[in-house]
């Protein structure tokens, strides 16, 4: 049964304006927006990415969609750090919850989140479905 649904869209250029150039690992590691949004493992991928702004935009959209599916948005006990986006062995995106996000998922009797991320030239979008 579906217990939550969330979607988000991000203008990639808006994020890219706040991100240092690819290859500048030191500056990327200090990027304030990335440090706020990304977990430690996501940050390592971001710093090594050839398109860090696009990577961050997609993760931002995915985390916002997940927070909306939880019914809280970011805040009210759920932070960006409580939602981690990874990829399985086939490259499919996965959403994982910890802390306040995991607590909220349990309150909804949720057991799993399904994530779809898409991007094109100007926009990144994500949808999360939570199931019980």
UniProtKB/Swiss-Prot annotation:
Catalysed conversion reaction: apo-[ACP] + CoA = holo-[ACP] + adenosine 3',5'-bisphosphate + H(+)
GO terms assigned for molecular function: holo-[acyl-carrier-protein] synthase activity; magnesium ion binding
Taxonomic superkingdom: Bacteria
Location in or out of the cell: Cytoplasm
Keyword Flavoprotein: no
Enzyme's top EC category: transferase
Free-text function comment from the UniProt entry: Transfers the 4'-phosphopantetheine moiety from coenzyme A to a Ser of acyl-carrier-protein.
Protein name: Holo-[acyl-carrier-protein] synthase
Organism, as annotated: Shewanella sediminis (strain HAW-EB3)
């Amino acid at each position: 049964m579906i217990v939550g649904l969330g979607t988000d869209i991000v203008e990639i250029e808006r994020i890219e304006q706040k991100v240092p150039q690819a290859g500048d690992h030191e500056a990327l590691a200090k990027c304030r927006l990335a440090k706020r949004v990304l977990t430690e493992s996501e940050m390592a991928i971001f710093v090594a990415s050839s398109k860090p702004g696009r990577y961050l935009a997609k993760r931002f959209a995915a985390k916002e969609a997940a927070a909306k599916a939880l019914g809280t948005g970011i805040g009210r006990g759920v932070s960006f750090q409580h939602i981690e986006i990874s990829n399985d062995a086939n490259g499919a995106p996965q959403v994982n919850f910890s802390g306040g996000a995991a607590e909220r998922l349990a309150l909804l009797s949720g057991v799993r989140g399904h994530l779809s991320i898409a991007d094109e030239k100007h926009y990144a979008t994500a949808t999360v479905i939570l199931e019980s």
